[in-house]
């Protein structure tokens, strides 16, 4: 008898028990049997039950042909103990079942076990009757095991039916309170729960700056949670959305290299490079990245909130942390370890060492002295022209100097065009005169002042200026200053910067979030930008911006629409090695206490992906992770390591913006590096999410919550980690713990005073037979064992045989 497999989940054992007992009661053949000159109807022998149940279990998909006959006998014993069956005389509760001709029958009561649920409370006037009936049932049940009586069984059945009718009546009366949930209600609960968990993990007061709730598709979440393999990979019902078989074969070949190359594959030189190029071409030709264009802002914002893009804290004046309670959560971002370049570290130390009075006086001097501002503007113009003429090897890659060379501040006459990227900081500047322009210019860019040409940054931006960045009256201002990404400058951008014909766009959410976080902490955007763009090898190579400007200025306008989002490796051959070392990701970008936050947040975000995209991402991450860790993998690139090549090749097909000029490939590469290191945790299914949704749906069904957003649900799980021990220590603890428990059992037998002496001797002999070493350790000699039972009982003396008195004759 075949049946569908019971799905994994809570109460699976109870469901299996109910399925087997139901099948056994429904299919076990019953007939008349004769025993001890009596006939019994509707019964079966133990041997017949073993045969039939054995065939049932072997043909059941939940058990399989591995079931043995002895296991079937053990299951029948459990049936007898739990009153699924009883002997022909009505006795049950023991496990006296063997493969013989003993007769059994089915009881009148149902053997099914109810799943744990919250029954409605009975009415007050039925509580007393229920308690009396309950007591009587328990008493009759105990008696029925030994001396069953017909009137007792009849009474217990009547009481059970009475209670059953009362519960059914109560269910009917409370049926109004139990709501019928539609599919829309269930989907809304999924959306609500995952957003609440994401907000709690990130620790933000609102998700408005992170994700739009309309972007959350509950159907994708439910599918990704339910349809997974044993390894957690999504299983697609529609195979047309899956990877082609030749791509899967190629991925398996490289993931298991060289073990999978024992087939009839060719072994010519460069075979593995051709296979890798085939896989890369497939993923790069996909119509959209695996994380989709829609969720680009989500993943960028997650990294911003988690500290992936660090904004150092700099307090100034009266603007302290108490002005913004949320800023206290980001105190850890000011650690010296968060700076990935020497220049940014020195800049931060330079700001911290500056005196507050010097900063105030310098700011007042710059604002009040128009001549000083004009001189600074002219000097910055000269620096701009000078940076265009400097060769690629004379400029530090990704430093703040390159930010100056990206725009001509003197020639701008309209607002520049901000890009949709989290690393940009283009800000509309209020003001029409050159005084305001130079004032903001000093706050936004490095300033070269004095004979020594020191790099100077203002440590106190104006709070009023930062608060009025997005006001409507500032949109029409003709001047703007900002930052450009070093890897995405195009010919069109350069023409717009030179001709002053840039169009204004609304800042994207990730940029506004980064700007808001820097505003709260009175810090700068240029410092984290320089920190992220800075290469480890400052003195080597050149920036992609310089190379892009020199190589693309001579191109015609017909090539503007081409994909110009090139990495540092594609733009410059001289910067190949620094870029590859930059993308290796060997040094963690996140601080240790922020790594767990990023993993949990990305775990929830990856559940939002369409199932085909999530499956492809899982398989891709597994492949590149294995390849990067495989020491036997041949070199796939002449100048790059395997890990650097994986990150550089697949960064565009994982994270990409809809407008390709806005892609920050460095950020995408670092995200791929983080996914490679933690893909097993990020791409697994969180169990706590399913539990929270089930509890929330249960509350909704019982009418405790009218809307999904009105109530509370289960709190987040608390993680506790145990100290890992070696295998040898585990084996030692296993043996010692087991022996200690057995020795404790022996002591309990010895000290049990309620146990009769004869029964105690019997148990001790049985214990000595099973565990002789432990018994000998407790009783090393026979004297110690004899002392346990105390003095031997005195033997009664035999009655004295008295001589019968002889009666004298009366004669």
Curated annotation (Swiss-Prot):
Region ranges (Interaction with ZNF224): 598-653
A biological-process GO annotation: intracellular signal transduction
InterPro entries, per database record: DEP_dom, Rho_GTPase_activation_prot, WH-like_DNA-bd_sf, WH_DNA-bd_sf
Pfam families hit by this protein: DEP (PF00610)
Keywords (A to Z) from UniProt: GTPase activation, Nucleus, Phosphoprotein, Repressor, Transcription, Transcription regulation
Gene Ontology cellular-component annotations: nucleus; transcription repressor complex
Signal peptide start and end residues: none
Principal location listed in the UniProt entry: nucleus
Cytoplasm keyword on record: no
Domain of life: Eukaryota
Function noted in UniProt: May be involved in transcriptional regulation as a transcriptional corepressor. The DEPDC1A-ZNF224 complex may play a critical role in bladder carcinogenesis by repressing the transcription of the A20 gene, leading to transport of NF-KB protein into the nucleus, resulting in suppression of apoptosis of bladder cancer cells.
This protein's name: DEP domain-containing protein 1A
Designated gene of the protein: DEPDC1
């Amino acid at each position: 008898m075949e049946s569908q497999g019971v799905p994994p989940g809570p109460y699976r054992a109870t469901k299996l028990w109910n399925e087997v007992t139901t099948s056994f009661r429904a299919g076990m053949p019953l007939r008349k049997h004769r025993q001890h000159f009596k006939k019994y109807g509707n019964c079966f022998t133990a041997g017949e039950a073993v045969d039939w149940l054995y065939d049932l279990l072997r043909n059941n998909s939940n058990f399989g042909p591995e079931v043995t006959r002895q296991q079937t006998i053990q299951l029948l014993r459990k049936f007898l103990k739990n009153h699924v069956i009883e002997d022909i005389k009505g006795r049950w509760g023991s496990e006296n079942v063997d493969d013989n001709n003993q007769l059994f029958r089915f009881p009148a009561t149902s053997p099914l076990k109810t799943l744990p649920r919250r029954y409605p409370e009975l009415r007050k006037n039925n509580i007393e009757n229920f308690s009396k009936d309950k007591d009587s049932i328990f008493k009759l049940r105990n008696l029925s095991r030994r001396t069953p009586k017909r009137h007792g069984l009849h009474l217990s059945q009547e009481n059970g039916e009475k209670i059953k009718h009362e519960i059914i009546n109560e269910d009917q009366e409370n049926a109004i309170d139990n709501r019928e949930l539609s599919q829309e209600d269930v989907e809304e609960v999924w959306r609500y729960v995952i957003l609440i968990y994401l907000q709690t993990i990130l620790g933000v007061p609102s998700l408005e700056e992170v994700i739009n709730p309309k972007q959350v598709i509950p159907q994708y979440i439910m599918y990704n949670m339910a349809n997974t393999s044993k390894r957690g990979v999504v299983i697609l019902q529609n195979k047309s959305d899956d990877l082609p078989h030749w791509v899967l074969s190629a991925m398996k070949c490289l993931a298991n290299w060289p073990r999978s190359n024992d087939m009839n594959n060719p072994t010519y030189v460069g075979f593995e490079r051709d296979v890798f190029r085939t896989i890369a071409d497939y993923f790069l030709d996909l119509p959209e990245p695996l994380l989709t264009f829609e969720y680009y802002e989500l993943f960028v914002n997650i990294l911003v909130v988690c500290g992936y893009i660090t904004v150092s804290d700099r307090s100034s004046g009266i603007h302290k942390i108490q002005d913004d309670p949320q800023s206290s959560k980001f105190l850890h971002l000011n650690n010296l370890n968060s700076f990935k370049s020497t220049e940014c570290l020195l800049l931060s130390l330079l700001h911290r060492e500056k005196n507050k009075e010097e900063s105030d006086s310098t700011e007042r001097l710059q604002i009040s002295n128009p001549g000083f501002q004009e001189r600074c503007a002219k000097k910055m113009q000269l620096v701009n022209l000078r940076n265009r003429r400097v060769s690629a090897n004379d400029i530090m890659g990704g430093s703040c100097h390159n930010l100056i060379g990206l725009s001509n501040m003197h020639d701008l006459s309209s607002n520049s065009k901000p890009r949709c990227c989290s690393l940009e900081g283009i800000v509309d500047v209020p003001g029409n005169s050159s005084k305001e322009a130079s004032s903001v210019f000093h706050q936004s860019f490095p300033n070269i002042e004095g004979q020594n040409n020191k790099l100077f940054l203002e440590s106190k931006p104006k709070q009023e200026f930062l608060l009025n960045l997005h006001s409507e009256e500032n949109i029409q201002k003709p001047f703007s200053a900002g930052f450009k990404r070093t890897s995405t400058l195009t010919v069109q951008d350069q023409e717009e910067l030179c001709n002053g014909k840039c169009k204004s766009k609304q800042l994207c959410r990730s940029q506004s979030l980064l700007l808001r976080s820097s505003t709260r902490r009175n810090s700068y955007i240029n410092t984290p930008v320089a920190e992220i763009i800075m290469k480890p090898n400052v003195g080597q190579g050149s920036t992609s911006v310089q190379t892009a400007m020199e190589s693309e200025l001579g191109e015609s306008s017909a090539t503007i629409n081409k994909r110009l989002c090139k990495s540092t490796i594609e733009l410059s051959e001289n910067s190949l090695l620094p870029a590859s070392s930059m993308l290796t990701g060997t040094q963690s970008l996140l601080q240790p206490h922020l790594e767990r936050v990023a993993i949990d947040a990305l775990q929830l975000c990856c559940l939002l992906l369409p199932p085909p995209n999530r499956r492809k991402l899982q398989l891709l991450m597994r492949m590149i992770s294995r390849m990067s860790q495989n020491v036997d993998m041949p070199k796939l690139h002449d100048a790059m390591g395997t890990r650097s090549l994986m990150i550089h090749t697949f960064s565009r097909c994982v994270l990409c913006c809809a407008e390709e000029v806005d892609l920050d490939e460095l950020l995408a590469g670092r995200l791929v590096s983080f996914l490679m290191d933690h893909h097993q945790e990020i791409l697994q299914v969180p169990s706590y999410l399913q539990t929270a949704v089930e509890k929330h749906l249960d509350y909704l069904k019982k009418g405790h919550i009218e809307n999904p957003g009105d109530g509370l649900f289960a709190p987040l799980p608390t993680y506790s980690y145990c100290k890992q021990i070696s295998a040898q220590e585990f084996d030692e603890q296993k043996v010692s713990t087991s022996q200690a428990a057995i020795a404790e059992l022996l002591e309990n037998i010895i000290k049990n005073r309620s146990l009769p002496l004869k029964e105690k001797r019997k148990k001790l002999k049985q214990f000595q037979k099973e565990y002789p070493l432990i018994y000998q350790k407790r009783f090393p000699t026979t004297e110690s064992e004899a002392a346990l039972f105390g003095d031997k009982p005195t033997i009664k003396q035999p009655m004295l045989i008295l001589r019968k008195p002889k009666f004298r004759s009366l004669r």
